[in-house]
Structure formats: C-alpha cells, structure tokens
Amino acid sequence: MILDLSDDAKEFGRQALKAFEAAGGDQLLVQADAKPDTRAALVVPVLDSLGVFELEPRSDADSLEAAAAVCRSAGYWALPYPVAERLASPHDLDADGLVVVDPAAPEAALQGLDNRWATVTLDGVRSTVARLGATGPSFATALELSAVDDAGCDDVALALTLPCWTLLGMLDRAIDLTTAHVSLRKQFGQTLSSFQGVQFQLTDAEVERSGVDMLAKYTLWSVGTNPADEAINDALALRLAAIEAAEVVFRVCHQLHGAVGFCDETVLSWLSRYSQPLRRSPFGVSKTRDVLTSRLGRRGLTGLFSS
C-alpha cells in the first residue's frame, strides 16, 4: 500500500490550484455569495478547461487520485461549486452529481444550481432531487426527493470521501493564512510567531490537519480496494476525523487572527463560514460518531492494525 497520491495526480492538483487562482481565487466565492445563481457560470468553464468532468473516479484508479487532488484544490480556494459531489455521480443514474443525505432532513449546498442531482443514504437508498426547498446560509438548501431504488450501497463511500478532501483543502488554507498572519503581525515589539504559546497552538492545529491528510489517503485506497461495507466504515471514520479536526483548526486560526478573523475583509472568515455545510451535512460530529459506532459494533475498523 502506497499512502500517497501519484505524481500525475499531485501535478493535476497543482494545475487546478493555479487555474482557480487565475480565474479569480477568493473573489469567486465573494461573487457567488452575492449572486448564487452565477455559481456554475463562474466555475464550470475552469473545470471544463482542466478536464475535471472527464475523470472517472468510480472505475479508474488514476482518476480517483486525480479527483481527490482537484477536490483538495477546490477546497483551498473555497470554490463555490460542488466539485466533489459532481465527481461522485453514479454511473447508472441519469444524474450530474450525488450527495449523501440524512433521510430525516435531506439538505445540501446546492442553492443556485440547476443540475440533475441524486442522493443516497448510508443504507443505499437512492433518490433524485425533485426540487430545492428553503435556503439557508452558505448555499445550503433543503431537498425534496423522489425515491428511485435501494441499490446505492456501492455509491456511498466515494460520495462521503471526496467532500472530506475538499474540507482538507480548506484546512490547508486556514493553516497557511494563519501562519502568514502571525508571521506578519507584531505585539510587544516582536512577531506573534515568536511567542511559544502561538507556536504550540499552531502545532496543535497542524497535527490535526496532517492526521486528516494521512487518513484521507488511506481512505482513498480503501474506496478503490475494499468491499462497499468496509469502505463506507473507513469513509465515515475519515469524515469524523475531518470534522473534529476542522473544529480544532478553525478555533485556533480564529483565536490567532483575533476579531479581524470574523470580518468579511479577511479570507479566513469566508473560509470558515463556507466550511459549515461540509462539516454539518449529512451529519455533524455527534451523529457521525453514533452512526459509525453502531455500524461497527464490537468489530472495530478493518485496516492495517486490525486483529
């Protein structure tokens, strides 16, 4: 097992990062926030130029790694478009993208988009989105569903995993922004980065981020290798680790930015706000933990260190 992306996948991610920056970078989100119905027009041409929608992550290992890399790059720039969900689309449904939902309260960050969307629950129950309901912050919207079948177990793991790569990209950016901030900002005649307490806080955040980085690579391998049930468990474990890490990383980054970190003039504010749908849907920390625990029972996760 090689727990790293291929050189080609990493290069694809780097090119995507540059393309998103050239297309407007942080301003893409600002513009989409003001006019959600422009999300596709702002982003899809860039994705088309990169050939993102030509990837086949469900059937090709190289495409799977490239898809993860581009999702991470999309997260870095908080790209106002559901790249991961588009790439997770199932082969056997007439849908442009796939979202994992909580059947009790299906929702997703799809405001302003007119694509054909499908949803799947952890039990493999698939539906199509009949219409978008009430909207909330950060493009979140309730979904009105039309049932299709219960044959979607093989679709779940990838649809859980790729959004975690998007969230990982957001954590990358939050750490980079905060490192730059404390290296520039001075207090008592010296930069904030020179204070030991600040160094400890940043180290705590980086440990969380790097842990998600490693687990995301393992889960990507699991999605492409293991049976559906094991892959779903690994994907849920990744999701739990990612949203727990996000709480630590964004808390530390906001603390070190101070009050300015909550102002729209700073990128961290936008990044933090638009990470919320990824962290809350389909489940937040508590329910993700409960679901994973109930699925595993006394068996534990299957992995490198299982007995």
Language model features with spans:
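FAD-binding core of flavoproteins
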Residues: 76-176, 180, 299, 303-307
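Alpha-helical interface subdomain recognition
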Residues: 1-75, 161-307
